[in-house]
């Protein structure tokens, strides 16, 4: 009884917490990461270009 009860509560809790948390984390981090990656990519290219030209 205790095992089945534990599994049921664990599964319900995991599913409930996992679905919304994953969605929010994915959407927010994806947008932020995309913007930052684009900016950092441009900066990295400029830095490498300047560094190479300097050398």
From Swiss-Prot:
Top-rank taxon, per record: Eukaryota
Subcellular location: Nucleus; Chromosome
Main subcellular localisation: nucleus
Transmembrane segments: none
Tissue expression pattern: Testis.
Region (Disordered): 1-55
GO cellular component: male germ cell nucleus; nucleosome; nucleus
InterPro entries: Nuclear_transition_prot1 (IPR001319), Nuclear_transition_prot1_CS (IPR020062)
GO biological processes: chromatin remodeling; flagellated sperm motility; heterochromatin formation; negative regulation of DNA-templated transcription; nucleosome disassembly; positive regulation of protein processing; sexual reproduction; single strand break repair
PROSITE patterns: TP1
Keywords: Chromosome, Developmental protein, Differentiation, DNA-binding, Nucleosome core, Nucleus, Phosphoprotein, Spermatogenesis
GO molecular function ontology, one term from the record: DNA binding
Biased composition (Basic residues): 1-42
Summary of the function given for this chain in its UniProt record: Plays a key role in the replacement of histones to protamine in the elongating spermatids of mammals. In condensing spermatids, loaded onto the nucleosomes, where it promotes the recruitment and processing of protamines, which are responsible for histone eviction.
Family to which the UniProt record says this protein belongs: Belongs to the nuclear transition protein 1 family.
Protein's recorded name: Spermatid nuclear transition protein 1
Species of the source: Rattus norvegicus
Record gene name: Tnp1
């Amino acid at each position: 009884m205790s095992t089945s009860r534990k599994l049921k509560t664990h599964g319900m809790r995991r599913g409930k917490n996992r679905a919304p948390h994953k969605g929010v984390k994915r959407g927010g981090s994806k947008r932020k990461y995309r913007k930052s990656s684009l900016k950092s990519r441009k900066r990295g290219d400029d830095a490498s270009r300047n560094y190479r030209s300097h050398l």
